[in-house]
Amino acid sequence: MKNRQDELKIQIAVVNWIKSNFPEIRYCASAGGMRTSLSVAKKMKASGYVKGFPDLFLYHPTMTKNGLAIELKTKTGRPSVEQKQWLEDLNARGYHAAITRSFEETIELI
């Protein structure tokens, strides 16, 4: 549970940094790692939520990439099989998809 809380703190800091420094960038955060009730989880799945989707997705293409997908982990956090598959698939489709392990590493990537 501690890792999830630490990852959430990193994600909140990154989102605030994006809002302050790049307000024009469109982004979306997934609900991954959030604890919900069984009924809410069923609704999320039925409405399209997919296990392993990256924590942050920036809809901001560059000259060489379609956008940026970030899976946030702590120094000791490990990605799931589904998270690894998402990152691999997105990279193969022209996105930059990566795992970052700190606030500093994440903003450097952005």
Pin down the residues of each PLM region.
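Catalytic phosphate/metal-binding cores of nucleic-acid and nucleotide-processing enzymes, i.e., regions
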Residues: 1-110
